[in-house]
């Protein structure tokens, strides 16, 4: 029976995302657990086009975009020390973390 912990990190800023990934990887490696990653997942780009003028000049438009960067970390066969180390990691405010526990029975 092998358990896995999957950690998905999302952020608009890839610098803070990479920093958070390094902190998690170093915390897990201190507990001597095996970790796969960071695996860069495809970034999602949302583009918005709006008119510059509210009345005329339809051809004058502005374009904005939001880039969402993602990383995946997989911890194989975690022990309680890994969970304790992950709970103590302090991450940046702009990084969203989703943790999934997967049990392989």
Swiss-Prot record:
One of its GO terms (molecular function) is structural constituent of ribosome. Transmembrane segments: none annotated. GO terms for biological process: translation. InterPro entries: Ribosomal_uS10, Ribosomal_uS10_dom, Ribosomal_uS10_dom_sf. It comes from the Bacteria. GO terms for cellular component: ribonucleoprotein complex; ribosome. Keywords: Ribonucleoprotein, Ribosomal protein. SUPFAM superfamilies: Ribosomal protein S10 (SSF54999). Belongs to the universal ribosomal protein uS10 family. This is Small ribosomal subunit protein uS10. It comes from Rickettsia akari (strain Hartford).
